Amino acid sequence: MVDDELTALVVDNGSGMCKAGFGGDDAPRAVFPSMVGRPRHQGVMVGMGQKDCYVGDEAQSKRGILTLKYPIEHGVVTNWDDMEKIWYHTFYNELRVAPDEHPILLTEAPLNPKINREKMTQIMFEAFNTPAMYVAIQAVLSLYASGRTTGIVMDSGDGVTHTVPIYEGYALPHAILRLDLAGRDLTDYLMKILTERGYNFTTTAEREIVRDVKEKLCYVALDFEQEMVTAAASSSLERSYELPDGQVITIGNERFRCPEAIFQPSFLGIESRGIHETTFNSIMKCDVDIRKDLFANTVLSGGSTMYPGIADRMQKEIVTLAPSTMKIKIIAPPERKYSVWIGGSILASLSTFQQMWISKQEYDEAGPPIVHRKCF
């Protein structure tokens, strides 16, 4: 049981951005890149107070002299030392709280290796000494945020995309599908196709510029072939973008060729189904009686669903795949970039949730595997 006076901290550690704040709030207080940067060069000025590592926005702003690394790849933490730095930064610099005074709700991608959540639990209790914690599945939180208990969530972030069917609040594990193709792969793909135009982007810092181009200018075409014809025939789809050094680049069909890869992964040389087929297959793995509810409640969540045109295209593709009489509704909430965090905030402030926390005492008795018993 957790004391009611204490506000929970809600931390959604995405592969690309970390969203953090307090349970009960309607938006995260801190949103910063999940990155750690280390200097590429030797410091020469004494007394400059140069650090051997920078986290988040500070790493982003000094990116020209740093090598940037993301400790979370495809939703799985690959570097625990850096991850601990990000959490430290979250608590002490961004939220300015003592983690040993608040219960902490963390999030993770479905179908993650079990050891991943055990290690998260261990670090929270042993390094940060938190009184209580919980690990929730990201897509389930997004559904909470949309005010539903039944539906299928297509959650696509920077590192991983997954489709999670949920019925009356329970995720159906046998029907969860995961696609290791998301925002970061689209950024890499845009870097590649911009090279064909003669623009060269190679370093980790330049990748961040391309990510910005992607976020500002890309969109999903309703009909890809038709859009390619339009782009070839006129310059109406061209847009320009000013680089940090003042050089202006022009981008045309790349605007929709880049996100097309989540519908056609073969563009990236990846042998897998696009998000529309993955969503459909996920629904078809469920019991025949509940499919109707899933088709009518298909919820998009995550930063890689923010492209203009994605909901219409998704609707069109799933209508093509599904039985002709089926009612299909794609829900794309405007705040879907943060819906995982918002769902976490809602969950952490529910009175019925308070007995779900893993307490320090339970952890001391059972060790890290307690997380599999209490969080599902």
From Swiss-Prot:
SUPFAM superfamilies linked to this entry: Actin-like ATPase domain (SSF53067)
Localization per Swiss-Prot or TrEMBL: Cytoplasm, Cytoskeleton
Alphabetized PROSITE patterns for the sequence: ACTINS_1, ACTINS_2, ACTINS_ACT_LIKE
CDD domains noted in UniProt: ASKHA_NBD_actin
Domain of life (superkingdom): Eukaryota
Keyword Nucleotide-binding recorded: yes
InterPro entries associated with the record: Actin, Actin/actin-like_CS, Actin_CS, ATPase_NBD
Listed Gene3D superfamilies: 3.30.420.40, Actin, Chain A, domain 4
Record keywords, A-Z: ATP-binding, Cytoplasm, Cytoskeleton, Nucleotide-binding, Oxidation
GO molecular function: ATP binding
One Gene Ontology cellular component annotation held by this UniProt entry: synapse
Modification type Methionine (R)-sulfoxide: residues: 45, 48
Post-translational changes noted in the entry: Oxidation of Met-45 and Met-48 by MICALs (MICAL1, MICAL2 or MICAL3) to form methionine sulfoxide promotes actin filament depolymerization. MICAL1 and MICAL2 produce the (R)-S-oxide form. The (R)-S-oxide form is reverted by MSRB1 and MSRB2, which promote actin repolymerization. Monomethylation at Lys-85 (K84me1) regulates actin-myosin interaction and actomyosin-dependent processes. Demethylation by ALKBH4 is required for maintaining actomyosin dynamics supporting normal cleavage furrow ingression during cytokinesis and cell migration.
Keyword hit for Metal-binding: no
Protein purpose: Actins are highly conserved proteins that are involved in various types of cell motility and are ubiquitously expressed in all eukaryotic cells.
Stated family: Belongs to the actin family.
Matches recorded under PANTHER family: ACTIN (PTHR11937)
Quaternary structure, from the entry: Polymerization of globular actin (G-actin) leads to a structural filament (F-actin) in the form of a two-stranded helix. Each actin can bind to 4 others. Interacts with PFN1 and PFDN1.
Other notes: In vertebrates 3 main groups of actin isoforms, alpha, beta and gamma have been identified. The alpha actins are found in muscle tissues and are a major constituent of the contractile apparatus. The beta and gamma actins coexist in most cell types as components of the cytoskeleton and as mediators of internal cell motility.
Full protein name: Beta-actin-like protein 2
UniProt organism field: Mus musculus (Mouse)
